[in-house]
Amino acid sequence: MRKGLIFDVDGVIIDVSHSYHYAIKNTAERFLRRDLDIELVREIKFKKGINNDYLATLEVIKTFGGSASLEEVIEIFNQEYEKLKEMERLILSRDFFKKLRDLKVPLGVLTGRPRQDLKDAFDRFELWEFFDVVVDDDTIEQPSLRKPNPYALNFCMERMNLDYAVYVGDSLADYQMVEGFKRQYTKRVDYIHFGDRVLPPSVKVVRSEEELFQALKEALQNQEEV
């Protein structure tokens, strides 16, 4: 059995609480012409399980009685994010990924980040060397099949030639993608939830790099016993 580990980026590898989250807030404020509480913005994104931040911004605007087109939101959002991206920090260290590489299993990324944003971040934090396969929001041509569609997870596993994977995510959308995958595909996938901004039911939750490393080791070892 070929086993591997697949990671979300935002909220798992990289802290985007001062970049993407504020880009949503600032963009919505420009359309609504009013100030918004950042925690209310986060609540809308996470509790509604919205993976795409452009769509999360539209939902915030709609929630507060405004309107905008997706094209307008994308243009303003990208301007706001460009001003904030240097605020990002690593959550999982390079040493963490070096330790994972010592486990001799392939590592992958499945993210909703646009390709250029991902490239900028991975260049900045020097992360490319750790991953065998990277699937970003531009990898899959048809938008409806991109993350969080379970097809995207299967696509990533196929590229990595895996029979079993652990997906590490931080959102309701991540959890729902894995649950959808289990209903549609025969390959085995386990989900580990990183952080506690939102807590899906009956899943393994870890809150630190150390806890995550141990949980990943245990998941891989458990497959050896199956």
Residue spans for each PLM region:
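Short beta->alpha linker loops
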Residues: 19, 95, 113-114, 148, ...
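Core-facing hydrophobic residues within beta-strands of well-ordered domains
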Residues: 2, 131, 188-189
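Acidic, Mg2+-coordinating phosphoryl-transfer loop and its flanking beta/alpha structural elements
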Residues: 167-207
